[in-house]
Amino acid sequence: MVDVSQHELVPEHTVLDEETLDGVLADYDIDRTELPKIKYKDPALPDNAEIGDVVEIVRDSRTTDEAVVYRLVIE
Amino acid sequence: TEFDVTDGVHDVIEDTELPRRLKDEVLATAEERGVTKSQANEIATAVEAQYLDTRVDPLDPVGTVSAQSIGEPGTQMTMNTFHYAGVAEMDVTQGLPRLIELVDARKTPDTPVMEVYLEDEYAEERERAHEVVWKIEATKILALGDISTNVADMVVRIDLNEDTLQERWPRVDSTTQIAGEVAETIEGNLGVTVTQDGTILEFGPSEPSYRELLQLVEQLRDIVFKGIEEVSRVVIRREETERGEEFVLYTEGSAFKKALKIEGVDATRTSCNNIHEVHKTLGIEAAREAIINETMTTLEEQGLDDVNIRHLMLVADIMTNDGTIESIGRHGISGNKNSVLARAAFEVTVNHLLDAAIHGESDDLDGVIENVIVGKPVRLGTGDVDLRMGATQTSD
């Protein structure tokens, strides 16, 4: 099988633990359902991610060095 | 760190609110010009002020600005270009049609192509690179030999070309063996018995039937003996990349998932211009990157490279926000707006108003369009700020 995470188009995805997540949501002052979404069957999703989890994505940004974004795992 | 500046200069620049990339740029310049600490301070303050000043203000309508910033250069793009540009002798849709195709999130692009990079041992020699070409390009019977139908004996005869066989199956030594493989493929696909004599293959329908004989020939032409069915042609080019000189393959037709699994294909750099295939194979984040890359290259090819990348990033963010690729337009983003008036203002006005009336929808007047329609201040920029007098009074 092809290891999707090695492709240059795919940024690093990691599952966020609840504690860090609470901090993030408090920072942005939003509910987790307001985050962008990622499908459960997404090939780049880490194996240990479950529906309802939030993944942290560290992109190699074009405008700054790194951009950290979050996506809620759905369906 | 990696910059040869004094600690004083370094600290002054590091203490600013600039993002990493800008700090590095300032540090590099400071190193090059050999500035003193007080000069560095002056530079850092000026750059920081400029940076803070050019940041997007709260309540700025970034979407509208992006729409205008992409739309205006769009008017300068060629309406219909279908030329052989960019890649050697390959036809790739460019310009406005390509941009529309991208934001519409069309299921298959007009001209699907893949850019296939090779693993080191295949990328250096033309011979080895060709091995990968034959694993990708679909080989059909017409490329392998001549077909003749003998109506009197009810047989289809294939004279396989030995040179072609040897070329396309470089790993097998005898052409008879290759012909055997070809015969097996035909048997498997058509359900007939093939008799082999060297590189000559013969077969026919089980019952003598003129119609069936012709049908077999028809079906024979469609069988893929080697390679990926979707790829009709592969162009091989020697290119200068960040890894030095190497062979890169360009395909007409795409099957991204299949291509990545092929031995010799570099599965970390190979890409595809179909954003849906990228989404299916590599996920939503890769699709977002692909949308940005594709839209930016489309603009650059037309000489419109001064469109800021942030506008395209915003478009890609919106298109991939819900975990799937959504198009911009009636069936995608604009069609899913909450406001009835906003949807009605976009396209097919009467239908939207009628549906809303039937379902008893209400409009909260949160967006821009709704407020323009009813003549209220738009809730953007200063329009979204309410001022109130402080409740405490001071006595003198």
Swiss-Prot record, chain A:
Q: Does the keyword Nucleotidyltransferase apply?
A: yes
- What are the UniProt keywords, alphabetically? Cytoplasm, DNA-directed RNA polymerase, Nucleotidyltransferase, Transcription, Transferase
Cellular localization per UniProt: Cytoplasm
Give disulfide pairs as residue numbers: none
Using the UniProt record, give the first listed, main subcellular location: cytoplasm
Catalysed transformations (reactions) = RNA(n) + a ribonucleoside 5'-triphosphate = RNA(n+1) + diphosphate
What SUPFAM superfamilies does this protein map onto? RPB5-like RNA polymerase subunit
- Enzyme Commission number(s): 2.7.7.6
Residues passing through the membrane, by range: none
One cellular component term from this protein's GO annotations in UniProt: cytoplasm
Q: Which GO biological process categories is it annotated with?
A: DNA-templated transcription
| Record flagged with keyword Manganese | no
GO MF annotation, one: DNA-directed RNA polymerase activity
A Pfam family cross-referenced in the UniProt record is RNA_pol_Rpb5_C
| Description of how the protein assembles with itself and partners | Part of the RNA polymerase complex.
Q: Which HAMAP family match?
A: RNApol_Rpo5_RPB5
Into which family does the record put it?
Belongs to the archaeal Rpo5/eukaryotic RPB5 RNA polymerase subunit family.
What does the record give as the function of this protein?
A: DNA-dependent RNA polymerase (RNAP) catalyzes the transcription of DNA into RNA using the four ribonucleoside triphosphates as substrates.
Quote the NCBIfam families the UniProt record gives.
PRK09570.1 (NF007129)
Q: What is this protein called?
A: DNA-directed RNA polymerase subunit Rpo5
Organism of provenance: Halobacterium salinarum (strain ATCC 700922 / JCM 11081 / NRC-1)
The root-end lineage is: Archaea, Methanobacteriati, Methanobacteriota, Stenosarchaea group, Halobacteria
From the UniProt record, report the name of the gene that encodes this protein. rpo5
